[in-house]
A protein has these predicted regions:
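Short acidic, glycine/serine/threonine-rich helix-capping segments at coil-helix boundaries
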Residues: 30-90
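Residues at the start of alpha-helices and the adjacent loop-to-helix junctions
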Residues: 5, 15, 36, 160-161
Length: 184
């Protein structure tokens, strides 16, 4: 019986260690080699957009991701330690244009978007006047970066360049019309 419990405990520990940490928004934690999760996927996609090869966005911060991060850090005159903290996260978005963004959603849930999606409470995406439907748009605000697909047309307010769904705005901590950096 004791051996059986020891084996069960070992299997449980293995499962717990194998489950990736799932901080889904880049900037919620410091990333380093060995980390896993959706935030690592976001990092890998952004590095790829900037021309740094990571071998694909698999969500595992491995050797190739660390090498790409260090190259990026050196080119931006940051401490090249291969870790992604607030300074590196800011630097990733620094070259993106500053845009005025607002959000939409409440009162429109259940309606179809211009790109064929049904808008729901948890739908994360952006509305843009001309980017093709499905284009991934990285957005930076409050030290956080997330990538959202274009799912609708808009915004329909003068002086606003980007419209986030309510769920996308919440993910970035946005509560009012705000300045964001967007990589398009």
């Amino acid at each position: 019986m004791r051996r059986f419990l020891t084996v069960q405990f070992a299997l449980l520990a293995l499962l717990v260690l194998a489950v990736p940490a799932n901080a889904s928004t880049l900037g919620q934690r410091v990333l380093e080699k060995g980390d896993r999760g959706d935030d690592v996927v976001t990092l890998q996609r952004i590095l790829g957009m900037k021309g740094y090869s990571v071998g694909g966005a698999d969500g595992v911060f491995g050797r190739r991701t660390k090498v790409a991060v260090k190259r990026f850090q050196r080119r931006r005159h940051l401490k090249a330690d291969g870790r992604v903290g607030p300074a590196t996260t800011r630097a990733l978005a620094r070259t993106w244009g500053v845009r005025t963004a607002t959000y939409y959603g409440p009162g429109l849930y259940g309606n179809r978007t211009a790109c064929g999606f049904t808008l729901r409470h948890r739908t994360r995406g952006v509305a843009h006047r001309s980017l093709p439907c499905g284009t991934r748009v990285p957005v930076y605000r409050n030290g956080l970066i997330a990538i959202f697909p274009v799912i609708d047309r808009g915004p329909h307010t003068s002086g606003v360049q980007l419209d986030l769904t309510h769920a996308a705005a919440r993910k970035l901590g946005m509560r009012t019309t705000s300045a964001v950096r967007a990589g398009y």
